[in-house]
């Protein structure tokens, strides 16, 4: 990457505060990115504190390695946070993590660097993979998927109401030549979109759906939440920042499910109720959003919502 793309960490102080960091605590940043949350958290930890960072992005890993070289309390791992359970177990830390942070937003360097293929505003190769060395690219998916599958991805993951029209236009155009550039795909999608939303690029939802599918973002989120709960110590905090309704719905339902427990599903006249049916999480406060001040400084924070829970057992 030749250019430097600035990233502003969303809900920085709020997220670190929500973790209630202890100086000698052991924490996990499941979405290291460019290290904004990790650096702020390290400032709260003492000499005995530890922080484990995860990311799939090779550029994020380079940033993480630089931070690890200057601060021995930090370790960076090139894995999806969906695999954090395996890593935590391998390090003998299961049930000993004091806080897990997941910031689910795509970082600005990823969005703004045309070579990563995420942007419909800046032309680049149609890739969209968080880790370009793994999985199929967006171009490969668009080239080989059936029209119905493309429409499903746009509708299910992008919540795009004109998904079928867009998929049909894509399949018709790819018979002439393959899609290799983001601008090329964005142009076809734009023409197929008959009703643009004011203030929103007509390719926004379709590109979101494609990115989520290529990176299995929702599946990873479900696995990561389960693994985070098992990794936490009793009293440990789970802090999740999501950026669209599909993510937030998964986070909300997960936290509510474990805050409610399974007692309601049992017969009322049972003489003894096992603890395995009791709640595992306690919800802490209401969802938090970016302040007016943060919105002015970083418009991309407008869709961020943070939810916090504490492990009970």
From Swiss-Prot:
Q: Which family does the entry's similarity section mention? A: Belongs to the methyltransferase superfamily. RsmH family.
UniProt EC number: 2.1.1.199
From which residue to which does any coiled coil extend? none
Q: What does this protein do?
A: Specifically methylates the N4 position of cytidine in position 1402 (C1402) of 16S rRNA.
Methyltransferase among keywords: yes
Q: What is its main location?
A: cytoplasm
An annotated Gene Ontology molecular function: rRNA (cytosine-N4-)-methyltransferase activity
Cross-referenced Pfam families: Methyltransf_5
Binding positions for S-adenosyl-L-methionine per the UniProt entry: 35-37, 55, 81, 103, 110
The name under which this protein is listed is Ribosomal RNA small subunit methyltransferase H
Read off the Gene3D superfamilies from this record: Putative methyltransferase TM0872, insert domain, Vaccinia Virus protein VP39
Where in or outside the cell? Answer: Cytoplasm
Q: What InterPro entries is this protein classified in?
A: RsmH, SAM-dep_MeTrfase_MraW_recog, SAM-dependent_MTases_sf
What is this enzyme's class at the first EC digit? Answer: transferase
The GO cellular component terms are: cytoplasm
Q: Where is the signal peptide?
A: none
Q: Which reaction does it catalyse?
A: cytidine(1402) in 16S rRNA + S-adenosyl-L-methionine = N(4)-methylcytidine(1402) in 16S rRNA + S-adenosyl-L-homocysteine + H(+)
Q: Name one GO biological process term.
A: rRNA base methylation
Superkingdom of origin organism? Bacteria
